[in-house]
């Protein structure tokens, strides 16, 4: 079986332009016609109401390179990382309420 990778996320947003700008400024991403592009990933924000939360644990995850880097992000968001057996992480929500996890694998 061939390898796969995530290519894009399609996120409903009441204010797609504003949400794209939030992701761009928060995570230092570039914006191209309301499409936020990061390394190998496209996030499309489409006009529309959120579809609701089918499961409370629905979120997107951003991997950071180290615990020090994670602590820097946590400080930016006034978060407190949780240390687990497999990874250290913390969660925030974007302005539309979508869950975001920032994490790094445990050493």
Where are these regions (language model features)?
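Conserved catalytic-core motifs of GNAT/GCN5-like acyltransferases
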Residues: 10, 30-34, 85
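Vicinal oxygen chelate
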Residues: 16, 60-99, 104-107
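Amphipathic alpha-helical segments
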Residues: 14-30, 74
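Conserved beta-strand positions that form and line the central face of beta-propeller blades
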Residues: 8, 44, 91
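Conserved short beta-strand elements that form part of the metal-binding/catalytic scaffold
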Residues: 27-58, 64, 99-105
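Residue-level preference for beta-strand/loop junctions
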Residues: 5, 54-56, 84
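N-terminal beta-strand motif that seeds the catalytic metal site of vicinal oxygen chelate
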Residues: 1-18, 58-60, 106
């Amino acid at each position: 079986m061939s390898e796969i990778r995530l290519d894009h996320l399609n996120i409903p947003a009441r204010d797609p332009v504003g949400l794209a700008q939030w992701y761009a400024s928060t995570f230092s991403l570039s914006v191209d016609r309301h499409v936020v592009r990061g390394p190998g990933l496209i996030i499309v924000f489409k006009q529309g109401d959120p579809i609701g939360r089918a499961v409370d644990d629905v979120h997107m995850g951003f991997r950071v390179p180290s615990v020090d880097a994670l602590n820097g992000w946590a400080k930016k968001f006034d978060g407190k990382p949780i240390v687990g057996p497999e990874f250290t992480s913390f969660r925030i929500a974007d302005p539309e309420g979508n869950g975001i996890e920032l994490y790094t694998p445990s050493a």
